[in-house]
Amino acid sequence: LDENAIAARKAAWEDVLTIHSCEMYPPDEAWDAIYDAIEEGRQPPWPETHLHLEPQDTSLPGWLALLELIEDAARDRRETFSPKEILGAELWGQVITLPPSIAKLKHVKKLNLYRSSLLRIPPEIGEMESLEQFVPYTSYGLHWFPYEITRCRHLKSSTVSTRALYGNYKYRPTFPELDPVVEALIPARCSVCDRLLESRGEVHQRWLSLNVATDILPLLVNACSIECVEQLPAPAQGYVPFPHKGGTSVVQPPAD
């Protein structure tokens, strides 16, 4: 790459790195090899990626304020939920995952998570039955989403930072390994049939890239059985063509 291309690349990532840093955003020397591979139609030499499993500090004022805000929004039957606008950047920046209580937001049509520090979205988002618009744009720590988001039947619009996503078509970064099972991300119920997961040993975790609203999202599936894995829909065209366990051995289609 010439000097102008390198400068443009640095500028493009400057905003990202002020918010979030991990293997998804490697140093410049790694990008040289990644771009060379993309141009030659080869599998980019991405490093192994790891899921963000940092726990939420539930003693922080930002977390406590968010819990109250969710209760208020549920009680008032609000149709737009934009926590940063109410909490402010400092308090909102203390939140790295949404609480399960977002399931109470039955009337919310627009969920605005713009420029957050979020690392995870809980599976309870699937219970937001009125959700139509999902905006996690510039939330660069959100590399994947729970399969349960596909239960939001009215969801028709999304604005996601594509370059932050595992397996995205631009760069094809590696999916984290799901073997062994990542116990910290196992929900109470099967992602597919909603059966209670009585034993963590029975869970089958898979990655699946699907069309969700106006984006193709990498989704984490927690299935109770192989039968439920087999019931999953076909992945989006141009992505890994089957549910998989991630890792550097998974061959992805060439980057665009």
Predicted feature locations:
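Short amphipathic alpha-helical patches
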Residues: 126, 137, 145-149, 172-173, ...
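Extracellular beta-strand scaffolds
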Residues: 119, 141-142
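The feature encodes a structural signal of leucine-rich repeats
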Residues: 98-100, 121-124, 145-147, 169-171
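Leucine-rich repeat
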Residues: 104-107, 127-131, 139, 148-155
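The feature captures the LRR N-terminal capping module
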Residues: 1-104, 140, 154-256
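Per-repeat beta-strand-to-loop junction in leucine-rich repeat
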Residues: 91, 114-115, 124, 137-138, ...
